């Protein structure tokens, strides 16, 4: 049975959404990918949507929406995106904080950099799960 991984931050509109999308690409054979937050936004960050579509061919407007922690199933692994003091708590067997800067309001270059970091971290995470390290 695949592990369930949740990528979490406060608003579930940018980094956690990017991570969910990339988890569905690079971890799909190894884990189920979810994202959530303690608050939702009416729409996902449109810069994040555009960058993920340009880089990976995935339209997050079609495949995802902003969700609350209570909207997702019980998970095995919680990945915090890096929300400092106000990061949401989600019960899980394993919790990590990736400490990513929020690119909201910054240049496309920052969004691309964030996406590439998330991609590498997800590939790493998938390998650890595959090797039964998590």
Model-derived segments and their meaning:
Residues 2-134:
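Short polar/charged helix/loop
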